[in-house]
Design a protein with these regions (language model features):
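Right-handed parallel beta-helix/beta-spiral solenoid domain characteristic of secreted/periplasmic
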Residues: 36-38, 61, 80-133
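Acidic Gly/Asp/Thr-rich repetitive segments characteristic of extracellular carbohydrate-active
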Residues: 32-63
């Protein structure tokens, strides 16, 4: 009887280990990596967005490495199905405001002072702070 209990206990432990190994989460894969220190495919987010093929049917996954990226982004309508995923500490920052003057000496206004212009469908963002400084 004692042997039978030990056998069942061993079986359950082995089964749990196999199940955990079989169903373990696979590491995320990315098409592009943006890193301000030059260790990725690009040093700016806009470069990575520009590199995405127009009207791509499959999702393009872009990893944004930890850091502060001071840039104004434009995501054209042709850059479909993009997922922009940040590491902890990924920040997109820009310092426009509505009364700031443009190159013609006119105020930009609210719609002209956006930090991100998003025209593309199916754009997904995860774990990124958008900061207006």
């Amino acid at each position: 009887m004692k042997f039978k209990k030990q056998f069942y206990l061993l079986f359950i432990c082995l089964w749990a280990g196999i199940t955990k190994t079989t169903f373990a989460q696979q590491p995320a894969t990315y098409d592009y990596v943006v890193s301000s220190n030059g260790k990725g495919n690009f040093t700016t987010i806009q470069e990575a967005i520009n590199a995405v093929p127009d009207f791509r049917k499959k999702q393009t996954r872009i990893l944004l490495s930890k850091g502060i990226y001071k840039e104004k982004l434009v995501v054209p309508a042709s850059k479909t199905n993009i997922a922009l995923i940040g590491e902890d500490g990924a920040v997109i920052s820009y310092d426009d405001y509505s009364n700031k003057l443009n190159v013609f000496g006119e105020t930009k206004g609210t719609s002209g002072s956006s930090s991100v212009y998003l025209y593309a469908p199916d754009f997904y963002v995860e774990n990124i702070t958008f900061q207006n400084t």
